[in-house]
Amino acid sequence: MPFVGIISKENDSNFIKNAISKNSKESNFEIININRKSIENVKNVKFDILVICENIEKMIKNSSYLEEIIRKSDYIIVNSDIKENLSILKNVEANIITYGFNAKATITISSIKEEKMMICVQRKIKAVNSIIEEQDFNVEIEKNNVNKLYNVLVIFTILAIYGKILQKI
């Protein structure tokens, strides 16, 4: 059972958790939202994947636990549109996968048309049991989820690490 920690607003974390559950019925993911109040409670958890959706500068300054959580994680999925996070992760040895709407992101969106989007893997990713090559993936997206594109990139990446391809959200 993969342990996934998500540093994000609670509603984003819940959206990601529900979508992962819906799209990976045979894999039981344990997904935990991490915030300033809960960080001490999860300080000893080794996350298979740590997702960083928001700026963690203040959280790092106020808690030594986050550095330890980052250090112990196998994969770190980070929003590369938040530049401050990239400098914090400079010396981390985990598999770092970036996502965002910039040319340097590992996972980005190459196009959106009505209810379809193309998610682009721009660099090889070492998944748990395979390698994900550079390529585009077509994903159907419901109209009410169009404003959650960052979350869709996170969901795609988590599933891909475990060999699953997101087709509809």
Predicted ranges, named:
Residues 26, 95, 165:
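Residue-level detector of anion-binding/catalytic polar loops
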Residues 1-76, 84-92:
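Phosphate-binding loop of NTP-binding sites
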Residues 27-28, 54, 71-75, 98-101, ...:
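Short, surface-exposed linear patches
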Residues 52, 59, 66-67, 97-99, ...:
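Broad hydrophobic/π-residue packing in well-ordered secondary structure
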